[in-house]
Amino acid sequence: MLQHSLSQAEAQARLNLAESQDGFFAKVRGSATNRLARRNCTYEAWNDQSLAAKAAALLDPEDQVDIVILDPSAEGGMPHTRPGLICLPAYYPESKLKETLAHEMIHISQKRQPTLWAARASNEGWSPVREVLPEFWASRLRLNPDTFGTLYAWEKRYVPLPVYIREDKPILREIEVRWFDIKEGIVKGSPPTTFTQTHGPLGHVQAEHPYELWAYSK
């Protein structure tokens, strides 16, 4: 039996509420590079929310999360989370729903229980970054609604930086992870040896932030 889905107006209202809670797009608007990366993206609730009902049927009702279907161009067509919401692009393949929802529910937990996940970060060698990043690199960081808020350093020294490959023509899906060495004050192209020894070789989507690392290794 399919679950109830929100109307387009209800879905848009949930998005507006989420923005009032996390201020993600206020931050995007304050970043020239991130605004440019979303120049062809429309972040609005889609007129057909029926996919949300199919996705909701795969979740436990106790998860207490709403699913919103967005314009297919929103966030480059990438599923993501906002406070209390899982956001999926229109026309997302139903065959991928189960795996994607499991991934996004990890991010929902990270938003709802920040203290718990901060403790895990500390236990696994991560610490919040207090230092100011070099402006050249800070301006190129791709803002991600799933990890928005806190940068982490591996071994209190190495900060993964998900940066756009091209600053002049940034594309949301085209990033690379550089590593800022706090001690040396320089940015390196390869992860520290200890990180690779611990986690193995990772793609950029896993390496960009510990929250993504854990969501992909669910």
Predicted regions and their residues:
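Auxiliary, metal-adjacent structural segments of Zn-dependent hydrolase domains
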Residues: 29-83
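Serine-dependent carboxylesterase/thioesterase catalytic core
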Residues: 110-120
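Soluble non-cytosolic domains of exported or imported proteins
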Residues: 45-50, 95-96, 100, 205-210
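Active-site scaffold of zinc-dependent metalloenzymes
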Residues: 61-65, 70-102, 106, 111
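Metalloprotease/metallohydrolase-associated module, dominated by Zn2+-dependent proteases
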Residues: 122-218
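N-terminal mature-domain "stem" immediately C-terminal to a signal peptide or N-terminal signal-anchor/transmembrane
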Residues: 1-43, 211
